[in-house]
């Protein structure tokens, strides 16, 4: 025990020396990163007690952002193992000192990985910023930072997109970064070196393997990535009456609007696993690594390997609970409507994750926040209707956004008369009008839904 404690202390000291947040009681340098790896270096007094709110103000001043940016962006502590948005009252230095404890509590990482992990401060979008409010922003620098973050998430596969959407986004990115289309300057040869900054590299790799055959021009022949992006670049609409600055703002908003169609836009990501359906002659099953995204609108479960949605639910469509049968196995339960062999059922999905507690708390807070700020008129706007039609169309086309229930193992229940027999975890909270007191009985499955 003594040896392990000494090792942990030594690792923590090394971590603090290497960290982007330097310790000390005098004026010290602090490094904050933007999503595009741009660095902001600040000199601050009282680093050990400075709050995220105070540091946020210094960053806004360094970037010459207006005070309205206070609600648009937040400070995050980021590492490959965990991402945490800091509250304004949090003290980043103290959270850094607790980082190893947070990793031990909320990840399954080995002791060695925990000791080697080093977080850094990042200035990025606040997950509690409503999309409608985002589109009201008129400051170009704020829109640029939001665009850079959205593009990063698309390129890295954190925001899985259909090929057709990537084409549109790539064309808009060309316009924003290369200026208005000029047929003499902008050719496939000029686009080719920039392709990995315009189009998700993982889709390019899939196409090389023959999986992407949807890149076709109007003549029906397969087009190159360069030509496809160039075609959408040509189609970006220009308004001659507006200034260059206003044109840039308009195109930033076009890019963001397109990303708003993704159910996980502006979310916080968590890591977990779900049960795979039993497959093969031996009826083998296992677990699938997933990312769970939580934002103001709902929860999405994304296949980390295939980069497509397994299930996406808005808050009116789900109930949830967090349980921990034992200390090392926390579970987030999602309950939603479905059907089994034509029979309407309630489905329970188990997500195994030591971050289930964080997910549950964030879901609850997002629902409370949405209910306190929602506008009845906004729910029935033409834009929302068009978005619903768009998503329905995508599902018919086997979009990456469509639910893939066949890839999930769920526990199914049906209503059973007037008597109440609780056969599922008791929910921590109930926010939905559809959640009257019900009686459920288990659907007898042909195979056991639990792990084998």
Swiss-Prot record:
Family matches, as CDD domains: FERM_B-lobe
Gene Ontology process terms (BP): negative regulation of canonical Wnt signaling pathway; positive regulation of tumor necrosis factor production
Membrane-spanning ranges: none
Predominant cellular place of this UniProt entry's protein: cytoplasm
Region of interest (Disordered), ranges: 373-395
Localisation: Cytoplasm, Cytosol; Cell membrane
Superkingdom as given in the UniProt entry: Eukaryota
Limits of the FERM domain: 28-374
One Pfam family hit: FERM_M
GO CC, any one term: cytosol
Keywords: Cell membrane, Cytoplasm, Membrane
InterPro entries noted in UniProt: Band_41_domain, FERM/acyl-CoA-bd_prot_sf, FERM_2, FERM_central, FERM_domain, KRIT1/FRMD8, PH-like_dom_sf
Start-end of Polar residues biased regions: 373-387
Cysteines joined through disulfide linkages: none
Function description: Promotes the cell surface stability of RHBDF1 and RHBDF2 and prevents their degradation via the endolysosomal pathway. By acting on RHBDF proteins, involved in ADAM17-mediated ligand shedding. May negatively regulate Wnt signaling.
Protein name in the entry: FERM domain-containing protein 8
Taxonomic classification: Eukaryota, Metazoa, Chordata, Craniata, Vertebrata
